[in-house]
From Swiss-Prot:
It comes from Ligilactobacillus salivarius (strain UCC118). Transmembrane segments: none annotated. Belongs to the TRAFAC class TrmE-Era-EngA-EngB-Septin-like GTPase superfamily. EngA (Der) GTPase family. One of its GO terms (biological process) is ribosome biogenesis. The keyword Nucleotide-binding applies. GTP 1 binds at residues 10-17, 57-61, 119-122. NCBIfam families: GTPase_EngA, small_GTP. GTPase that plays an essential role in the late steps of ribosome biogenesis. One of its GO terms (molecular function) is ribosome binding. The keyword Acyltransferase does not apply. This is GTPase Der.
Amino acid sequence: MANPVVAIVGRPNVGKSTIFNRLAGERISIVEDTPGVTRDRIYARTEWLGHPFNLIDTGGIDIGDEPFLTQITEQAEIAIEEADVIIFVVSVKEGVTDADEKVARILYRTDKPVVLAVNKVDNPELRADIYDFYSLGFGEPIPVAGTHGIGTGDLLDKIIKEFPKDATNEEDDSIKFSFIGRPNVGKSSLVNAILGENRVIVSNIEGTTRDAIDTRFETEDGTKYTMIDTAGIRKKGKVYENTEKYSVLRAMRAIDRSDVVCVVLNAEEGIREQDKHVAGYAHEAGRAIVIVVNKWDTLKKDNKTMSDFENLIRQEFQYLSYAPIVFVSAKTKQRLDKLPELIKRVNDNHEQRISSAVLNDVVMDAIAHNPTPTDNGKRLRIYYATQVAIKPPTFVIFVNDPELMHFSYERFLENQIREAFDFEGTPIHIIERRRK
Protein backbone atom coordinates (compact mmCIF):
# COMPACT_ATOMS: atom_id res chain seq x y z
CA MET A 1 0.00 0.00 0.00
CA ALA A 2 1.21 3.49 -0.79
CA ASN A 3 1.39 5.99 2.03
CA PRO A 4 -1.85 7.99 2.42
CA VAL A 5 -1.83 11.40 0.75
CA VAL A 6 -2.99 14.50 2.65
CA ALA A 7 -3.63 17.63 0.57
CA ILE A 8 -3.88 21.18 1.92
CA VAL A 9 -6.36 23.44 0.08
CA GLY A 10 -7.84 26.87 0.62
CA ARG A 11 -7.99 30.35 -0.85
CA PRO A 12 -4.80 32.48 -0.98
CA ASN A 13 -3.42 34.07 2.20
CA VAL A 14 -5.03 31.72 4.71
CA GLY A 15 -1.63 30.29 5.67
CA LYS A 16 -1.56 27.00 3.72
CA SER A 17 2.21 27.04 3.28
CA THR A 18 2.77 27.92 6.94
CA ILE A 19 0.68 24.93 8.00
CA PHE A 20 2.49 22.75 5.44
CA ASN A 21 5.88 23.78 6.82
CA ARG A 22 4.68 23.32 10.39
CA LEU A 23 3.32 19.83 9.75
CA ALA A 24 6.36 18.84 7.71
CA GLY A 25 8.90 20.33 10.08
CA GLU A 26 9.11 20.67 13.80
CA ARG A 27 6.25 18.53 15.03
CA ILE A 28 6.81 15.46 12.86
CA SER A 29 9.79 13.75 11.28
CA ILE A 30 10.58 14.25 7.63
CA VAL A 31 12.92 12.14 5.54
CA GLU A 32 16.15 14.08 5.07
CA ASP A 33 16.58 15.98 1.84
CA THR A 34 19.07 14.67 -0.65
CA PRO A 35 21.18 17.42 -2.29
CA GLY A 36 19.85 18.25 -5.72
CA VAL A 37 16.40 16.77 -5.15
CA THR A 38 14.18 19.87 -5.12
CA ARG A 39 14.26 23.42 -3.90
CA ASP A 40 10.71 24.71 -3.56
CA ARG A 41 8.94 21.58 -2.41
CA ILE A 42 5.20 21.17 -2.60
CA TYR A 43 5.30 17.76 -0.95
CA ALA A 44 6.89 16.12 2.06
CA ARG A 45 7.15 12.56 3.30
CA THR A 46 6.16 12.77 6.96
CA GLU A 47 4.75 10.79 9.86
CA TRP A 48 2.71 11.27 13.01
CA LEU A 49 2.48 8.73 15.85
CA GLY A 50 3.97 6.04 13.63
CA HIS A 51 1.64 6.72 10.68
CA PRO A 52 3.64 7.73 7.58
CA PHE A 53 1.94 9.88 4.96
CA ASN A 54 2.64 12.28 2.11
CA LEU A 55 1.69 15.93 2.51
CA ILE A 56 0.87 18.15 -0.49
CA ASP A 57 0.51 21.93 -0.57
CA THR A 58 -1.73 22.41 -3.61
CA GLY A 59 -1.08 26.15 -3.43
CA GLY A 60 2.44 25.42 -4.64
CA ILE A 61 1.13 24.03 -7.92
CA ASP A 62 1.53 26.77 -10.50
CA ILE A 63 -1.43 26.97 -12.86
CA GLY A 64 -0.26 29.93 -14.88
CA ASP A 65 -1.68 33.45 -15.09
CA GLU A 66 -5.30 32.52 -14.51
CA PRO A 67 -7.69 34.41 -12.20
CA PHE A 68 -7.10 33.34 -8.64
CA LEU A 69 -10.59 31.83 -8.26
CA THR A 70 -9.85 29.59 -11.25
CA GLN A 71 -6.55 28.61 -9.65
CA ILE A 72 -8.33 27.77 -6.38
CA THR A 73 -10.79 25.62 -8.31
CA GLU A 74 -8.11 23.66 -10.12
CA GLN A 75 -5.95 23.24 -7.02
CA ALA A 76 -8.98 21.87 -5.15
CA GLU A 77 -9.69 19.50 -8.04
CA ILE A 78 -6.11 18.23 -7.81
CA ALA A 79 -6.64 17.61 -4.09
CA ILE A 80 -9.89 15.74 -4.73
CA GLU A 81 -8.18 13.60 -7.36
CA GLU A 82 -4.95 12.80 -5.54
CA ALA A 83 -5.64 12.92 -1.80
CA ASP A 84 -6.96 10.42 0.71
CA VAL A 85 -7.63 13.19 3.25
CA ILE A 86 -8.11 16.93 2.53
CA ILE A 87 -7.22 19.75 4.95
CA PHE A 88 -9.42 22.75 4.14
CA VAL A 89 -7.67 25.83 5.58
CA VAL A 90 -9.61 29.03 6.36
CA SER A 91 -8.63 32.13 8.34
CA VAL A 92 -10.36 33.29 11.52
CA LYS A 93 -9.25 36.88 10.79
CA GLU A 94 -11.50 37.34 7.75
CA GLY A 95 -14.31 34.96 8.70
CA VAL A 96 -16.18 32.99 6.05
CA THR A 97 -15.54 34.56 2.62
CA ASP A 98 -17.05 34.01 -0.82
CA ALA A 99 -13.83 32.28 -1.87
CA ASP A 100 -14.06 29.91 1.12
CA GLU A 101 -17.60 29.02 0.07
CA LYS A 102 -16.41 28.39 -3.49
CA VAL A 103 -13.77 25.94 -2.25
CA ALA A 104 -16.39 24.29 -0.02
CA ARG A 105 -18.76 23.78 -2.96
CA ILE A 106 -15.99 22.02 -4.89
CA LEU A 107 -15.14 19.81 -1.92
CA TYR A 108 -18.80 18.78 -1.54
CA ARG A 109 -18.30 16.74 -4.74
CA THR A 110 -15.96 14.27 -3.07
CA ASP A 111 -16.68 11.51 -0.61
CA LYS A 112 -13.15 11.84 0.77
CA PRO A 113 -12.82 13.11 4.34
CA VAL A 114 -12.33 16.86 4.72
CA VAL A 115 -10.75 18.25 7.90
CA LEU A 116 -11.57 21.94 8.46
CA ALA A 117 -8.64 23.88 9.96
CA VAL A 118 -9.30 27.47 11.10
CA ASN A 119 -5.89 29.16 11.01
CA LYS A 120 -4.51 32.26 12.75
CA VAL A 121 -6.26 31.51 16.06
CA ASP A 122 -3.25 32.84 17.94
CA ASN A 123 -5.04 34.09 21.05
CA PRO A 124 -7.85 32.57 23.16
CA GLU A 125 -10.30 35.41 22.43
CA LEU A 126 -10.48 34.33 18.79
CA ARG A 127 -11.62 30.79 19.60
CA ALA A 128 -15.26 31.86 19.88
CA ASP A 129 -15.13 33.03 16.25
CA ILE A 130 -14.36 29.56 14.87
CA TYR A 131 -18.00 28.49 15.22
CA ASP A 132 -18.97 30.68 12.25
CA PHE A 133 -17.17 28.10 10.09
CA TYR A 134 -19.70 25.38 10.91
CA SER A 135 -21.69 27.01 8.10
CA LEU A 136 -19.24 25.54 5.57
CA GLY A 137 -20.65 22.09 6.29
CA PHE A 138 -17.56 20.10 7.29
CA GLY A 139 -18.30 19.50 10.94
CA GLU A 140 -16.25 20.72 13.88
CA PRO A 141 -13.55 23.25 12.92
CA ILE A 142 -10.11 22.71 14.45
CA PRO A 143 -8.46 25.95 15.66
CA VAL A 144 -4.77 26.24 14.77
CA ALA A 145 -2.05 28.86 14.56
CA GLY A 146 0.41 27.67 11.94
CA THR A 147 2.98 30.33 12.80
CA HIS A 148 3.17 29.22 16.45
CA GLY A 149 2.32 25.54 16.08
CA ILE A 150 -0.79 25.88 18.25
CA GLY A 151 -3.31 23.11 17.58
CA THR A 152 -1.20 21.17 15.09
CA GLY A 153 -1.22 18.07 17.30
CA ASP A 154 -5.03 18.06 17.37
CA LEU A 155 -5.08 18.57 13.61
CA LEU A 156 -2.72 15.65 13.02
CA ASP A 157 -4.68 13.39 15.38
CA LYS A 158 -7.82 14.12 13.36
CA ILE A 159 -6.02 13.53 10.05
CA ILE A 160 -4.67 10.08 10.91
CA LYS A 161 -8.10 8.96 12.16
CA GLU A 162 -9.37 9.59 8.63
CA PHE A 163 -6.72 7.48 6.86
CA PRO A 164 -8.17 4.69 4.72
CA LYS A 165 -7.86 1.19 6.11
CA ASP A 166 -5.85 -1.22 3.98
CA ALA A 167 -8.35 -2.48 1.46
CA THR A 168 -6.64 -5.82 0.94
CA ASN A 169 -3.99 -8.01 2.46
CA GLU A 170 -3.76 -10.43 -0.42
CA GLU A 171 -0.27 -11.53 -1.34
CA ASP A 172 1.08 -10.27 -4.64
CA ASP A 173 4.31 -11.91 -5.72
CA SER A 174 4.80 -9.72 -8.78
CA ILE A 175 7.60 -7.15 -9.09
CA LYS A 176 6.03 -3.70 -9.08
CA PHE A 177 7.87 -1.14 -11.19
CA SER A 178 7.21 2.23 -12.76
CA PHE A 179 8.69 4.52 -15.39
CA ILE A 180 9.08 8.03 -14.01
CA GLY A 181 10.43 11.16 -15.62
CA ARG A 182 9.42 14.55 -16.85
CA PRO A 183 7.06 14.98 -19.81
CA ASN A 184 8.36 14.01 -23.25
CA VAL A 185 11.08 11.59 -22.15
CA GLY A 186 9.13 8.77 -23.78
CA LYS A 187 7.53 6.98 -20.83
CA SER A 188 4.37 6.01 -22.73
CA SER A 189 6.38 4.68 -25.66
CA LEU A 190 8.49 2.59 -23.29
CA VAL A 191 5.40 1.18 -21.61
CA ASN A 192 3.87 0.17 -24.94
CA ALA A 193 7.14 -1.26 -26.25
CA ILE A 194 7.80 -3.29 -23.10
CA LEU A 195 4.31 -4.78 -23.15
CA GLY A 196 4.58 -5.50 -26.86
CA GLU A 197 7.95 -7.20 -26.55
CA ASN A 198 7.80 -9.11 -23.31
CA ARG A 199 4.30 -10.01 -22.34
CA VAL A 200 3.04 -13.55 -22.24
CA ILE A 201 -0.17 -12.73 -20.36
CA VAL A 202 -1.46 -9.25 -19.72
CA SER A 203 -4.36 -8.03 -17.62
CA ASN A 204 -5.50 -4.60 -16.55
CA ILE A 205 -6.31 -4.36 -12.85
CA GLU A 206 -7.81 -1.61 -10.76
CA GLY A 207 -5.04 0.41 -9.17
CA THR A 208 -5.21 1.50 -5.57
CA THR A 209 -4.98 5.15 -6.61
CA ARG A 210 -8.03 6.78 -8.16
CA ASP A 211 -8.65 5.79 -11.77
CA ALA A 212 -5.17 4.36 -12.33
CA ILE A 213 -4.92 1.13 -14.27
CA ASP A 214 -1.90 -1.05 -13.51
CA THR A 215 -0.79 -3.67 -16.01
CA ARG A 216 0.37 -7.13 -15.06
CA PHE A 217 2.43 -9.28 -17.39
CA GLU A 218 4.59 -12.36 -17.21
CA THR A 219 7.80 -13.01 -19.10
CA GLU A 220 8.70 -16.36 -20.65
CA ASP A 221 10.80 -17.35 -17.62
CA GLY A 222 7.70 -17.10 -15.41
CA THR A 223 8.59 -13.83 -13.67
CA LYS A 224 5.50 -11.76 -12.87
CA TYR A 225 5.57 -7.98 -13.15
CA THR A 226 3.09 -5.21 -12.35
CA MET A 227 3.69 -1.97 -14.22
CA ILE A 228 2.43 0.87 -12.02
CA ASP A 229 0.37 3.44 -13.89
CA THR A 230 1.71 6.97 -13.45
CA ALA A 231 -1.31 8.71 -15.00
CA GLY A 232 -2.79 11.45 -12.88
CA ILE A 233 -5.78 13.67 -13.57
CA ARG A 234 -7.12 12.74 -16.97
CA LYS A 235 -8.74 15.96 -18.06
CA LYS A 236 -7.33 16.91 -21.43
CA GLY A 237 -6.43 20.52 -21.95
CA LYS A 238 -5.99 21.38 -18.30
CA VAL A 239 -3.14 23.86 -17.95
CA TYR A 240 -1.70 21.99 -14.98
CA GLU A 241 -1.56 18.62 -16.75
CA ASN A 242 2.05 19.13 -17.84
CA THR A 243 3.30 21.58 -15.24
CA GLU A 244 6.54 20.45 -13.67
CA LYS A 245 5.27 20.36 -10.12
CA TYR A 246 2.16 18.40 -10.98
CA SER A 247 4.17 15.77 -12.84
CA VAL A 248 6.48 15.47 -9.80
CA LEU A 249 3.40 14.86 -7.66
CA ARG A 250 2.19 12.22 -10.11
CA ALA A 251 5.59 10.50 -10.05
CA MET A 252 5.60 10.57 -6.26
CA ARG A 253 2.41 8.48 -6.17
CA ALA A 254 3.89 5.90 -8.53
CA ILE A 255 7.20 5.73 -6.64
CA ASP A 256 5.43 5.00 -3.36
CA ARG A 257 3.71 2.00 -4.94
CA SER A 258 6.79 0.61 -6.72
CA ASP A 259 9.50 -1.85 -5.73
CA VAL A 260 11.70 -0.72 -8.63
CA VAL A 261 11.71 2.75 -10.18
CA CYS A 262 12.98 3.25 -13.72
CA VAL A 263 14.15 6.86 -13.98
CA VAL A 264 13.74 7.75 -17.66
CA LEU A 265 16.03 10.33 -19.28
CA ASN A 266 15.78 11.74 -22.80
CA ALA A 267 19.06 11.19 -24.67
CA GLU A 268 18.32 14.14 -26.97
CA GLU A 269 17.83 16.65 -24.15
CA GLY A 270 20.34 15.46 -21.57
CA ILE A 271 19.72 15.94 -17.84
CA ARG A 272 17.38 18.61 -16.46
CA GLU A 273 16.62 19.76 -12.92
CA GLN A 274 13.30 17.94 -12.88
CA ASP A 275 15.07 14.66 -13.66
CA LYS A 276 16.97 15.16 -10.41
CA HIS A 277 13.78 15.97 -8.50
CA VAL A 278 12.00 12.72 -9.30
CA ALA A 279 15.15 10.58 -9.03
CA GLY A 280 15.93 12.12 -5.67
CA TYR A 281 12.47 11.32 -4.39
CA ALA A 282 12.88 7.66 -5.43
CA HIS A 283 16.23 7.56 -3.64
CA GLU A 284 14.77 9.13 -0.48
CA ALA A 285 11.96 6.59 -0.58
CA GLY A 286 14.50 3.74 -0.53
CA ARG A 287 13.38 2.19 -3.82
CA ALA A 288 15.53 0.10 -6.15
CA ILE A 289 16.47 2.24 -9.15
CA VAL A 290 17.39 1.69 -12.80
CA ILE A 291 18.39 4.68 -14.95
CA VAL A 292 16.91 4.30 -18.44
CA VAL A 293 18.25 6.57 -21.19
CA ASN A 294 15.57 6.56 -23.90
CA LYS A 295 15.72 7.77 -27.54
CA TRP A 296 19.30 6.52 -27.84
CA ASP A 297 18.66 5.89 -31.55
CA THR A 298 18.35 9.64 -32.21
CA LEU A 299 21.95 10.54 -31.32
CA LYS A 300 24.89 10.68 -33.68
CA LYS A 301 27.43 8.49 -31.91
CA ASP A 302 31.11 7.70 -31.87
CA ASN A 303 33.00 5.23 -29.67
CA LYS A 304 32.91 7.64 -26.70
CA THR A 305 29.26 8.78 -26.79
CA MET A 306 27.95 6.17 -24.38
CA SER A 307 30.81 6.47 -21.88
CA ASP A 308 30.57 10.29 -21.97
CA PHE A 309 26.82 10.17 -21.28
CA GLU A 310 27.35 7.66 -18.49
CA ASN A 311 29.99 9.91 -16.92
CA LEU A 312 27.55 12.85 -17.10
CA ILE A 313 24.89 10.79 -15.32
CA ARG A 314 27.33 9.75 -12.59
CA GLN A 315 28.35 13.38 -12.12
CA GLU A 316 24.78 14.74 -11.97
CA PHE A 317 23.31 11.87 -9.92
CA GLN A 318 26.12 11.25 -7.46
CA TYR A 319 23.71 9.85 -4.87
CA LEU A 320 22.65 7.16 -7.40
CA SER A 321 26.10 5.65 -7.89
CA TYR A 322 24.58 2.22 -7.20
CA ALA A 323 21.99 2.45 -10.02
CA PRO A 324 22.69 0.60 -13.29
CA ILE A 325 22.30 2.55 -16.54
CA VAL A 326 20.75 1.12 -19.69
CA PHE A 327 20.61 2.92 -23.06
CA VAL A 328 17.46 2.03 -24.98
CA SER A 329 15.14 3.07 -27.77
CA ALA A 330 11.41 2.52 -27.45
CA LYS A 331 11.13 3.21 -31.17
CA THR A 332 13.66 0.64 -32.44
CA LYS A 333 13.33 -1.70 -29.39
CA GLN A 334 17.12 -1.44 -28.88
CA ARG A 335 18.10 -3.24 -25.62
CA LEU A 336 14.50 -3.31 -24.41
CA ASP A 337 14.72 -7.08 -24.02
CA LYS A 338 17.33 -6.48 -21.27
CA LEU A 339 15.09 -4.25 -19.17
CA PRO A 340 12.76 -6.76 -17.43
CA GLU A 341 15.76 -8.93 -16.57
CA LEU A 342 17.56 -5.90 -15.10
CA ILE A 343 14.45 -4.88 -13.13
CA LYS A 344 14.28 -8.40 -11.68
CA ARG A 345 17.96 -8.36 -10.74
CA VAL A 346 17.83 -5.08 -8.85
CA ASN A 347 14.59 -6.18 -7.16
CA ASP A 348 16.33 -9.38 -5.98
CA ASN A 349 19.16 -7.23 -4.60
CA HIS A 350 16.62 -4.94 -2.92
CA GLU A 351 15.21 -7.99 -1.08
CA GLN A 352 18.56 -9.60 -0.33
CA ARG A 353 19.36 -10.78 3.22
CA ILE A 354 22.91 -11.35 4.45
CA SER A 355 23.56 -13.66 7.39
CA SER A 356 25.06 -11.97 10.44
CA ALA A 357 28.07 -14.31 10.43
CA VAL A 358 29.01 -13.52 6.82
CA LEU A 359 28.30 -9.80 7.30
CA ASN A 360 30.52 -9.59 10.37
CA ASP A 361 33.37 -11.33 8.53
CA VAL A 362 33.22 -8.54 5.93
CA VAL A 363 32.99 -5.74 8.52
CA MET A 364 35.85 -7.07 10.66
CA ASP A 365 38.01 -7.59 7.58
CA ALA A 366 37.30 -3.98 6.56
CA ILE A 367 38.35 -2.74 10.02
CA ALA A 368 41.57 -4.76 9.82
CA HIS A 369 42.48 -3.05 6.54
CA ASN A 370 41.32 0.43 7.58
CA PRO A 371 41.18 0.96 11.38
CA THR A 372 38.28 2.91 12.87
CA PRO A 373 38.70 6.68 13.38
CA THR A 374 39.45 8.47 16.63
CA ASP A 375 38.12 11.76 17.99
CA ASN A 376 39.93 13.58 20.81
CA GLY A 377 41.82 10.42 21.63
CA LYS A 378 38.71 8.24 21.77
CA ARG A 379 38.53 5.45 19.17
CA LEU A 380 35.35 4.20 17.55
CA ARG A 381 34.84 0.54 18.45
CA ILE A 382 32.63 -1.65 16.28
CA TYR A 383 31.36 -4.75 18.07
CA TYR A 384 29.11 -6.41 15.52
CA ALA A 385 26.67 -5.78 12.68
CA THR A 386 23.36 -7.30 11.67
CA GLN A 387 20.82 -6.80 8.90
CA VAL A 388 17.45 -5.67 10.27
CA ALA A 389 15.40 -4.97 7.13
CA ILE A 390 15.09 -5.35 3.37
CA LYS A 391 13.62 -3.05 0.69
CA PRO A 392 16.04 -1.36 1.15
CA PRO A 393 18.65 -3.53 2.90
CA THR A 394 19.25 -1.92 6.29
CA PHE A 395 22.13 -2.74 8.62
CA VAL A 396 22.60 -1.87 12.27
CA ILE A 397 26.19 -1.59 13.50
CA PHE A 398 26.63 -1.74 17.28
CA VAL A 399 29.39 0.59 18.51
CA ASN A 400 30.75 2.14 21.70
CA ASP A 401 29.65 5.67 20.69
CA PRO A 402 27.63 6.51 17.53
CA GLU A 403 29.01 10.08 17.60
CA LEU A 404 32.45 8.69 16.71
CA MET A 405 31.24 7.29 13.37
CA HIS A 406 32.41 9.81 10.77
CA PHE A 407 30.36 9.88 7.56
CA SER A 408 33.47 9.05 5.52
CA TYR A 409 34.06 5.86 7.52
CA GLU A 410 30.40 4.91 7.18
CA ARG A 411 30.77 5.39 3.42
CA PHE A 412 33.88 3.17 3.52
CA LEU A 413 31.92 0.42 5.28
CA GLU A 414 29.08 0.75 2.77
CA ASN A 415 31.54 0.38 -0.10
CA GLN A 416 33.06 -2.72 1.51
CA ILE A 417 29.60 -4.27 1.94
CA ARG A 418 28.77 -3.46 -1.69
CA GLU A 419 32.04 -5.02 -2.88
CA ALA A 420 31.33 -8.21 -0.95
CA PHE A 421 27.67 -8.58 -1.95
CA ASP A 422 25.68 -7.67 -5.04
CA PHE A 423 23.62 -4.64 -4.08
CA GLU A 424 23.56 -3.10 -7.56
CA GLY A 425 20.44 -1.01 -8.04
CA THR A 426 19.49 -0.62 -4.40
CA PRO A 427 20.35 1.94 -1.74
CA ILE A 428 21.54 0.45 1.53
CA HIS A 429 21.04 2.08 4.91
CA ILE A 430 23.51 1.87 7.79
CA ILE A 431 22.44 2.79 11.32
CA GLU A 432 24.82 3.06 14.29
CA ARG A 433 23.59 2.07 17.73
CA ARG A 434 25.32 2.17 21.08
CA ARG A 435 25.83 -1.32 22.49
CA LYS A 436 24.04 -1.60 25.82
